[in-house]
């Protein structure tokens, strides 16, 4: 058994990096600690130009770089020095003049950045597949008992601290080894994903029109948190996040206070935050079991999120109990006070939180308070759905509509006020489990029908919710996430007083549905876009 606390001194290091962030400072500190440095190509030149003593690998091996740099470090004096087992291979190393290399600092050719550039062709991509780098990384990782492998610039500081304390412990080297294999696994996964999308049916292999979906699907997530349990207490769970999230979300949020997030907290907070991102004006979204139960937008900044919260809460105060609340503006003291004095809440998330609001929420120690940071444009990404023995992969639903995208299909067009409410209700319906029906007035939900097998029943539930909350349906608008297959959905809407409807259209019986709306004097618009959510 290896002693976890035994420290490994570093006498010789090999440095060869594409990303040179922090490498000059790291090398200077190593030099100051008496470490001999071997280096290659651009890294060697950077060190030399800045007065850091280093030996070029070609001078050390006696073998010049060749094949336009394809062969630099693939040499027994390099890999023997990395893979040589101290105390076992010493004699053979001495016989061949191989010096032990105790630390390897390597990161790889920027394959992902290269293939992301417009116009990148297959030969360019191939030339940016690193060979020597991963080979050194894997060699050093395999021999982590005797060698430290550093692939992340973020680790330079802790490595130097340990060296100043006498060396790296085995536990530290093991952790660095794990990071190294994670690094090479992600790198190879990127290459396989890219090449797996190449059109192999063409006479000449081409990346033009390459498939979005490679032959094997490789992606990497990093464990952020182990949880007490999963969706239910008998299930184990953990939360994994993308290594480099491209967009603000629950995966990048910062928790300011409260109990540890549960599995359901994460899922519900994601639903609330993604919904509230849809709105430009001050907005509040309250979610329960991944469904919005109350959403409202304040038409001006004067009322702000306090007014939006009051209206969202009024939609369904019963369901709001123990829910998740998301805002698209900084959480202020007045809104925080209104929440803690009125209801039990699991999670509150906002782009930022004022000092006064944070102090108020602190009186409820169990409330989980999160900041998301401010978001910008929604970016394309993948959505995943696990099935038994497989994985469904699709592009994320970031489809949005504006008034210009809508097609008025009835004799009566919506009024300006109705149009604003229709677009609001449509944005909400996108985040409601199918079949989804949303009733809204004055950019406030007044009833949400979610997750029913029958669209008509979802509409009935929305009406029941509105009645129970004491909110008037007469004159409200209705949004449906998918088309109405029969006219009964519109007939029921007319009975409760709905004045305008927004839906995708596309049913075989659209003409019957439109006729039902015309008979009732209901204005109806088609979006041409469906928002199923399962």
UniProtKB/Swiss-Prot annotation:
The keyword tRNA processing does not apply. It catalyses: (6R)-10-formyltetrahydrofolate + 5-amino-1-(5-phospho-beta-D-ribosyl)imidazole-4-carboxamide = 5-formamido-1-(5-phospho-D-ribosyl)imidazole-4-carboxamide + (6S)-5,6,7,8-tetrahydrofolate; IMP + H2O = 5-formamido-1-(5-phospho-D-ribosyl)imidazole-4-carboxamide. It comes from Pseudomonas syringae pv. tomato (strain ATCC BAA-871 / DC3000). GO terms for cellular component: cytosol. It comes from the Bacteria. Pathway: Purine metabolism; IMP biosynthesis via de novo pathway; 5-formamido-1-(5-phospho-D-ribosyl)imidazole-4-carboxamide from 5-amino-1-(5-phospho-D-ribosyl)imidazole-4-carboxamide (10-formyl THF route): step 1/1; Purine metabolism; IMP biosynthesis via de novo pathway; IMP from 5-formamido-1-(5-phospho-D-ribosyl)imidazole-4-carboxamide: step 1/1. CDD domains: IMPCH. GO terms for molecular function: IMP cyclohydrolase activity; phosphoribosylaminoimidazolecarboxamide formyltransferase activity. The IMP cyclohydrolase activity resides in the N-terminal region. PANTHER family: BIFUNCTIONAL PURINE BIOSYNTHESIS PROTEIN ATIC (PTHR11692:SF0), BIFUNCTIONAL PURINE BIOSYNTHESIS PROTEIN PURH (PTHR11692). Gene3D superfamilies: 3.40.140.20, Methylglyoxal synthase-like domain. Pfam families: AICARFT_IMPCHas, MGS. Belongs to the PurH family. Keywords: Hydrolase, Multifunctional enzyme, Purine biosynthesis, Transferase. The keyword Repeat does not apply. This is Bifunctional purine biosynthesis protein PurH. InterPro entries: AICAR_Tfase_dup_dom_sf, Cytidine_deaminase-like, MGS-like_dom, MGS-like_dom_sf, PurH-like. Residues 6-151 form the MGS-like domain. One of its GO terms (biological process) is 'de novo' IMP biosynthetic process.
């Amino acid at each position: 058994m290896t002693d976890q606390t035994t420290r490994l001194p570093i006498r010789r290091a090999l440095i060869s990096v594409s990303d040179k962030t922090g490498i000059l400072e790291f090398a200077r500190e190593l030099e100051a600690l008496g470490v001999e440095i071997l280096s290659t190509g651009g890294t060697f030149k950077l060190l030399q130009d800045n007065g850091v003593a280093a030996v070029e690998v070609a001078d050390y091996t006696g073998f010049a770089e060749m094949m336009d740099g394809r062969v630099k470090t693939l040499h027994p004096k390099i890999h023997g020095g990395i893979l040589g087992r101290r105390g076992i291979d010493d004699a053979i190393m001495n016989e061949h003049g191989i010096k032990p290399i105790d630390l390897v600092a390597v990161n790889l050719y920027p394959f992902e950045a290269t293939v992301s550039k417009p116009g990148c062709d297959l030969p360019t991509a191939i030339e940016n597949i690193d060979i020597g780098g991963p080979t050194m990384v894997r060699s050093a990782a395999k021999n982590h008992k005797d060698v430290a492998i550093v692939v992340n610039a973020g680790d330079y500081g802790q490595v130097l601290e340990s060296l100043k304390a006498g060396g790296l412990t085995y536990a530290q080297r093991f952790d660095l080894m794990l990071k190294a294999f994670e690094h090479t696994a992600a790198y190879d996964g990127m290459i396989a994903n890219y090449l797996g999308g190449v059109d192999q049916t063409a006479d000449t292999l081409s990346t033009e029109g390459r498939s979005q979906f490679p032959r094997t699907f490789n992606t990497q997530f990093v464990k952020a948190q182990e949880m007490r349990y999963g969706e239910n207490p008998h299930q184990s769970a953990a939360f994994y996040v993308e290594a480099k999230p491209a967009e603000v979300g629950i995966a990048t949020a910062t928790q300011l206070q409260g109990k540890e997030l549960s599995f359901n907290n994460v899922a519900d907070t994601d639903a609330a935050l993604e919904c509230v991102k849809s709105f430009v004006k001050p907005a509040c979204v309250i979610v329960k079991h991944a469904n919005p139960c109350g959403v409202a937008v304040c038409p001006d900044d004067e009322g702000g999120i306090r007014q939006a919260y009051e209206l969202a809460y009024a939609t369904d105060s019963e369901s709001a109990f123990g829910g998740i609340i998301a805002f698209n503006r900084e959480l202020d003291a007045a809104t925080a006070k209104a929440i803690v004095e009125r209801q039990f809440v699991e999670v509150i998330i906002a782009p930022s939180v004022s000092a006064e609001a944070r102090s108020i929420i602190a009186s409820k120690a169990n409330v989980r308070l999160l900041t998301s940071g401010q978001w910008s444009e929604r970016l394309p990404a993948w959505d995943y759905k696990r099935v038994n023995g497989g994985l469904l992969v699709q592009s994320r639903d970031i489809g949005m509509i504006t008034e210009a995208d809508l097609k008025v299909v009835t004799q009566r067009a919506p009024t300006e006020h109705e149009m604003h409410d229709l677009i609001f209700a449509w944005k909400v319906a996108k985040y409601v489990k199918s079949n989804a029906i949303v009733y809204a007035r004055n950019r406030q939900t007044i009833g949400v029908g979610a997750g029913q097998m029958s669209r008509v029943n979802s509409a009935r539930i929305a009406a029941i919710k509105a009645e129970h909350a004491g909110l008037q349906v007469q004159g409200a608008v209705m949004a449906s996430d998918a088309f109405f297959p029969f006219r009964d959905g519109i007939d029921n809407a007319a009975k409760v007083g709905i004045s305008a409807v927004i839906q995708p259209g596309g049913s075989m019986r659209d003409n019957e549905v439109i006729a039902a709306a015309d008979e009732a004097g209901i204005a109806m618009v088609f979006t041409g876009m469906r928002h199923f959510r399962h």
